[in-house]
Regions:
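Short, glycine-/small-residue-rich phosphate/pyrophosphate-handling segment
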Residues: 137-152
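ATP-binding N-terminal substructure of ATP-dependent carboxylate-amine bond-forming enzymes
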Residues: 1-123, 130, 134-136, 140
Length: 152
């Protein structure tokens, strides 16, 4: 008879795994924040600022990661992260990037950080730059899905 692991046991196993990972890696958070990210090139009708984190949300994410055991570096815009990653003063292989930054207004704005991570061989959480850009292009995504018999 197969042994079933309870949801609580699975959560505990994931938590223990995260603790082990925190011993090897640090987290870099690249996020847009409503109080710390300047975005002068915003859309007027559909502001990208609606997707920015509040200070409270930002702090909750950071505190959760730190409570697990991760050291966390914080960047509130892409430019500061670009300066850090392109002029490394330390080993970049010890980092995992958690990205939710999107300061720009063009279609590829969410693929910038994953592209740089790929260029500098830095691990990151989330989709690769191609998938991010493809999924942001609703027309092309819809065409691909229709080609495979999936209606949109």
């Amino acid at each position: 008879m197969a042994k079933y692991i309870s949801a609580l046991q699975r959560i505990e196993a994931m938590f223990q795994s995260a603790i082990e990972i925190s011993k090897k890696y640090e987290i870099i958070m690249v996020t847009s924040n409503e109080n710390h990210t300047d975005n002068t090139n915003d859309y007027s009708d559909n502001s990208v600022k609606s997707e920015f984190f509040s200070d409270q949300e930002q702090n909750l994410i950071r505190q959760t990661l730190e409570n697990i055991g991760f050291k966390v570096k914080q960047f509130f815009n892409e430019e500061d992260f670009i300066s850090f990653i392109s002029n490394p003063r330390e080993n970049l292989s010890k980092y995992i990037v958690l990205n939710s930054a999107q300061k720009g207004t063009k279609i590829g704005r969410k693929s910038l950080i994953p592209s740089l991570c790929d260029l500098y061989s830095v691990k990151y959480i989330g989709s690769n730059p191609y998938i991010v850009s493809l999924c942001r292009d609703k027309y092309r995504t819809s065409c691909i899905l229709k080609q495979h018999g999936i209606s949109t």
